[in-house]
Amino acid sequence: MATTSTSNMSRNGGFCGALQRAPPPMPPTLIRRLSSRECYGVGKVKVMLRVADRDRNSGGTEPDFMALDKKKRQVTLTDPRTACPPPQAAQERAPMVAAPKMFAFDNLFTGEDKQSDVCASALSEVIPAVLEGSDGCLLAMGYPATGQAQTVLGELGGGSGSGSASGSGVACSLGAAPCAIAWLYKGIQERRQKSGARFSVRVSAVGVSATKPDALSQDLLISHAAESDDSPGIYLRDDFLGGPTELRAPTAERAALFLDSALAGRLKSSGSTASGSSGCAAPLESALIFTLHVYQYSLSRKGGVAGGRSRLHIIDLGGCANRNGGLPLSGIGNILLAILSGQRHPPHKDHPLTPLLKDCLAPITCHVAIVAHVRPEQSYQDALSTIQIASRIHRLRRRKHRVPMPLAVGLAQGLGGNGSSAGSGADPSSSEISADTVIYMGPNDDATDGEHPPVYLPSLTAGDNRGVMSKALKGSGLEKPPSKSASNSPMMMKKAMAAEKAKKLPGSHTGSLKRQAGAGACSSPMIPHEQPQIQAMGSPIPIPRHMVSKGSMVPSPKGSPMRRAHPGAALEQLEAGMRKITEEQWIDGPRVSRAKVAEARHLMREVNHVKQCETWVDGPKSQSCRSLTACNLPAAGGSQTQGYGFMDAHKKTMIRQWVENQTTQVFQSTVSASNSPTALHWKLSQLKQKSLDLPDRPAFNPEPSLDLNQPCFESLPLLDPAPPDGDEDEDSGPSEVPPALPLLDDPLGSRDISQDNLHRMLSRHVSREQLHEAELVASRASSSHHPSQRSIDCGLQVTEEEIARTMSRDRDHDPSAHPLSALSHCDNISFVSSFNMACESFSECGERARQQFDQLARLHEIFTSQLAMAEVTPSAALFRTDIGSVFSEPVYHFNVGQSSVCSEPAYRLTPSPPKQPSHSPSQGSLPSLNGIMEIAGMDDYALLRQPDGASDPNLQKGEKRFTPQHDDICELDEKSMAAAVGKGNSLEDAQHKLNEITNILPLAAQSRLPLLPLNTSSEAYDSGHDSNSTPRTSKHSGISRRAESGYHSVATVRDSDESSFASGMSKGQRHRITVSGTGAVTSAGIGNYQRQCHKKRHRQDQAGNNKGLCNWLLTPFSCTYPETEGEISDF
């Protein structure tokens, strides 16, 4: 037989040539299944029996012990030893006569059936499952020379069998393996056209020796390993195989070629022969496992990639089931039963065939088709053992799944310990006893097992006991629970509970939906069953036990994690649920009705709707937002406050920490924003706008507050030590949220103040005398009522100049009232410092310190308005001189050092010119700043804290320090101002007045001054490149290095909107080299320029010798090295 097949394959080109010449047509059943695309879930096992034809060459002396019924798909076996007994023996042994054995299968084939019908029936469910992503397997089992090769491989000759009516072609005689290859590729092509999925098919083949159980499995395609790259299966494999070679097969002919190669290697590996049951010698072929690996993927609707790997196994056990050192057929049956029943450790695990079969058949989604083969020429025992193994696998497949039982029965069986395991293993008894004793109920309630005639027991024939027994075995009695009366039905109880809840619900719609449901449930007096009641700590109101968690003893809603059931309480909840069902429960979500959801959505859509009865759990809390829940329990004894309802102590601590962290961040950001010049200018503008809109205020406010830092305290959450009463649900509606702070988007230069508003504001200020008298009255009242507030913190340090000025002003008072007299009269003075927090200093400074800060705010407001009035329209003379230059701004002298970083604020230019001419007065007609000081009453601002070691800013040595250096600048500016304005007020007077204001203001307030707009014309802005009045110098000149390097950089003052690095000294030096409109340089400017160049060379010579890091740190912006002299260094 092997020689014949080999010659046919070599002569006709094998299966590859057969598929090229005449591929087998796809059967109609397979076409219907591929078009329907059924959902293949748990794998099925389909068992078929194929009986070969009787060999005509053999004698017909053997009795026929096998009867076939193809209509019923049954086979009947009769023992030939008891088929024709003698009459005497029959009478003596009448009770001992063995009945014929009947076996039923999914399909039954004989020699009269075509090969294509056998392949179509075996592969009709396997190939669609593989295309859907599941595994499929076709297994041929039986003793050697029983027709397994005919089923799997077929014949390459002309006819299919002796029962063929007409001679069919080669396509009708192909076996299941070539047909599976052809039909699988056709299905892949159709699936690719319909769904657009991409497929990749690879082939592998493994052989197992039939007579050497210790031999390892052999890779039959190892010779073609160099033709293919690494398989994707190496990333998916986790089995015993170790990875056979997977060769890429893009076409069906390529896969068939690999099948021919595997068969050639299989024949070489079989070397022993044995005597078959028919008496002829035949070689024992090794087992063959031919696998088609299908890799597919497609793009899903959501943009992802869906796909994976599926496998189609074609297994021919060949001659493994033999008695010459191989594995017996009963052993193969036990392996199959163990694997298909889900056992972890199948028998004969040392045999190389066992892990291979487990890898193919173990997946639960694998669809298996088993074809058992028998021959009439076999002995009765061999045929019976083969059919019994196939029948046991068939019964295993048809075993009904367990009926889903109620929870009570399942728990009772689990707790009792008498429950059976999930899957029963193979029957360890022999096949004879198993076939005689197993009785099951057929599809029509027939008491037959498919192997014997119906056997009726006496206990089942009386009355209707048979029907009751059938229902009991099928489990129908457990599916239907006993019916109850209509009054006690769960639906009636649900309706009653719903009606009761509707009556008890309050009329308010602002509460939480779940709290209303909980209130109705708790307040309802009609509860069907008795629930254990407990009381909250010190509360007289009872609460149902199922609403209270064991850890916190505080009522908790159903959606909280505290309510999750644990295994210990499963039986208790089951017993309560079996007694009566109180209310409808939504297991996987909140218990909210559809009407309440619609009501909540309607309330949330309203714009002006604010829920007043809910608490913002993770945000600010206020006294007005108290939660009014149904279980609003008072505290026990007044000492214990209510918490967050269902939250435990850990969650409460986390929320408190979160609130504290957010409070700290908000406070820091607000303080930093309020200290910036932009924020301060905006706050003062808002204050001034409010003061203009409000009616006239009284002369004195007995409780002044620090208005500058007020928003930072308002933005903090109100930390209430007592949490709100009652519990709060997580999914409550939105509560009242404080409005967001307005954003400051307008530039500072766009904030213009009219002259009318300024005069109106000045008229509302009190005079200096009234303010001083009010301060004295307030200080006396505060000292009489609160004597402890007179002790100001030692953090407010004073200097000797301030003490001297205070003593000179208070000469008429008692000499003993010295500011430091308390230190000499008190023996033990111990005051607690308040340097820890910035907020404590404001509360401990007393009334006087707050009044001083209020005065500082008003002074800043007035000074800002006066600077706004300084926006004058320049005359023609100014345009003719240097109106287009950045040096055209007036010079102001500040009493600070030349190397100070906080020298003077940078002045911002107006972004756009006004559409109307300015009606503000000129610079020469500015109001008297001394009069402003007298009106505002700023005499006491010198008492504010100065830096440690600072001298009196009112001393005149600060003015004399810079006056000699700016004589020429003052002369030049006075001439230009006199020509432009034509009035007697010179720049020195305005400068002197400005210095007086600067001396009164502390240094911290000076740094917060708003930006002074120089001109209302857009032409006043100079980019440094288009100005005609600025001298054009080369890149390496001294002027460019002086103007573009380091600290005195023109770009630093011009380009930065909030730069404060341009000092008055540097501006004065720039004015010395300013060129007039006619291009002539003044003599004073030329002399100053020469002196500056001489000083610059001297500094460059010194810088060449001082290149150390310390020298650069001392003078970082004036240290220029000779080798980098020509380059620009902008910081």
Curated annotation (Swiss-Prot):
It is found in: Cytoplasm, Cytoskeleton. It comes from the Eukaryota. Gene3D superfamilies: Kinesin motor domain. Its main location: cytoplasm. Keywords: ATP-binding, Cytoplasm, Cytoskeleton, Microtubule, Motor protein, Nucleotide-binding. Residues 483-494 have a biased composition (Low complexity). GO terms for cellular component: cytoplasm; microtubule. Disulfide bonds: none annotated. Residues 1-25, 472-494, 693-753, 905-926, 1016-1072 are annotated as: Disordered. Residues 44-396 form the Kinesin motor domain. One of its GO terms (molecular function) is microtubule binding. SUPFAM superfamilies: P-loop containing nucleoside triphosphate hydrolases. InterPro entries: Kinesin-like_fam, Kinesin_motor_dom, Kinesin_motor_dom_sf, P-loop_NTPase. Residues 1-11, 1016-1032 have a biased composition (Polar residues). Belongs to the TRAFAC class myosin-kinesin ATPase superfamily. Kinesin family. KIF26 subfamily. This is Kinesin-like protein CG14535. The lineage of its organism: Eukaryota, Metazoa, Ecdysozoa, Arthropoda, Hexapoda.
